[in-house]
Amino acid sequence: GSWIYENHPEWTLGDGTTRFFNYGNPEALAWMTDHVDSLLKSEDIDLYRQDFAVMSSDYWNEEDRKNPDRQGIAEIKHVIGYLKYMDELQRRHPGMLIDICAAGGKRLELENLRRAVPLWRSDYAFEPVGVQGQTYGLSAWIPFSGAGVNRITAYDFRSNMSPSIVLNLDSRVKDAD
């Protein structure tokens, strides 16, 4: 397991082998903030990516079952802690770009968008019609987001065009235009 899993299981939610870091735990929040801050400084990092491809509701629902009189509190504490974490990173690193990503766009909500941009908006990517739908649906509300292209046809490329685009192409292909 990870260092956190082995040394501080109380900083996580869940009882199985897969656990979820709990930003709602003040001690865990302080440690994570200081740890990431020190890595950003020591490695001279100026763009931070916060990925969130986790079914967090499973962990929060499990906590709700343990505390039936406190439904939703685990999620509320986690979200408040997470937003404090993001705010503190921005305070310590003014001007640093923060990229948010989540399976299916779970981090594309207003409070998070005040703090970060989705350079990669969803792991549902590359499929032209689906990405067109994402771009159409998001553009009025979230003008800056990213997608990617992994095929070299004009249709695929244009379908995946967005303000931020990832080119996932094989540079060894000699006849690629």
Where are these regions (language model features)?
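Active-site-proximal substrate-binding groove within the catalytic cores of carbohydrate-active enzymes
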Residues: 54, 82-177
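Non-membrane alpha-helical structural segments and their capping/turn regions in soluble enzymes
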Residues: 25-33, 72, 76-83
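Active-site-adjacent "subsite" loops/lids of carbohydrate-active enzymes
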Residues: 1-42
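Short acidic, gly/pro-rich beta-turn/loop elements at beta-sheet edges
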Residues: 3-4, 60, 108, 170
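Aromatic- and acidic-residue-enriched segments that line the glycan-binding/catalytic groove
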Residues: 1-15, 63-64, 112-122
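Generic beta-strand/beta-sheet core signal
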Residues: 6, 14, 48-53, 99-103
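Glycine-rich tight-turn/loop motif centered on a GG-T
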Residues: 10-19, 62-78
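Active-site groove signature of glycoside hydrolases
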Residues: 17, 31-68
